A protein has these predicted regions:
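Conserved structural motif at the start of ABC-family nucleotide-binding domains
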Residues: 3-5, 18-20
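The feature captures the beta-strand-to-loop junction immediately N-terminal to the Walker
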Residues: 31-36
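Conserved ABC transporter NBD signature motif
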Residues: 54-70, 207-209
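Catalytic Walker B motif of ABC-type/P-loop ATPase nucleotide-binding domains
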Residues: 150-154, 159
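Helical segment within the ABC ATPase nucleotide-binding domain
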Residues: 164-176
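Conserved beta-strand-loop-alpha-helix hinge in the C-terminal portion
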Residues: 204-227
Length: 235
């Protein structure tokens, strides 16, 4: 399965966010989307998830322009969860309304334990969860339905070291059957986890293969590109 961006454009008023960008994202790979604040990473995710219409070009999934019937997993930077429910209640409800998309559902407690939520917190209100715990629950919903495309907006940044390590293992385990794209400001995370880094800069997408990650001046060259100081960079 492939997610293809073909001459995709998006702007708000006179500000161009995506300028006829082209890129192909393939199943079985993890992509890191890097860019400065305000570069348009969230806008790109919203276009892919069809929360926003593009102004030009097209986005296709598995050669289909209309893929609204395909589940797109989207983990937002700010969790969007019902604060009045407990973690257990929410996951139970989520499983019930997505029953036709889940092949072998587990007990909600099993899922919560999987992502490192302590048993004592399973029946606590979500509003009392830390930001990191809420992010775990939000990511869990995408793992339960196993969507073919998973968009992660600044994942792992609110997790502690142990939780981040566990989430990395989970992402690697679902990688063969998933197109995973995550935005991040943490270069070391992208280098550690990704098969390819995609830079979003001045409305354009630029791909960097994993083979370049270990270059001794990789980080320096990347910063130069994003700060418009690069001249003849080989990245």
């Amino acid at each position: 399965m492939k997610l293809v961006l073909n001459q995709v454009s998006k702007k708000f008023d006179d500000k161009v966010i995506l300028n006829e960008v082209n890129h192909t994202f393939e199943m079985g790979k993890i992509y890191g989307l890097l860019g400065k604040n305000g570069a348009g990473k969230t806008t790109l995710f919203n276009c892919v998830s069809q929360n926003l219409m593009v102004d030009g070009g097209q986005i296709t999934l598995d050669d289909r322009l209309d893929y609204r019937d395909t589940q797109i997993g989207y983990v937002y930077a700010t969790p969007r969860l019902p604060a009045f429910m407990t973690g257990y209640e929410f996951i139970k409800y989520f499983i019930e309304i997505h029953a036709d998309e889940i092949s072998e559902a587990k007990d909600p407690s099993d899922y919560l334990t999987l992502i490192g939520i302590e048993e004592a917190d399973h029946h606590a209100l979500i509003r009392d969860y830390s930001h990191g715990m809420q992010n775990k629950v939000q990511m869990l919903t995408s793992l339960i339905t196993a969507p073919p495309v998973l968009l992660l907006d600044e994942p792992l940044t609110s997790f502690d070291v142990v939780a981040a390590h566990e989430m990395k293992k989970i992402l690697l385990s679902i990688k063969p059957e998933t197109i995973i794209i995550f935005s991040t400001h943490i270069l070391s995370l992208a280098q550690d986890l990704c098969d390819e880094i995609v830079l979003l800069h001045h409305g354009d997408l630029r791909s960097i293969d994993a083979s370049d990650f270990q270059s001794p001046d990789f980080e320096e060259q990347l910063i130069k590109i994003l700060s418009d100081q690069a001249e003849g960079s080989e990245l």
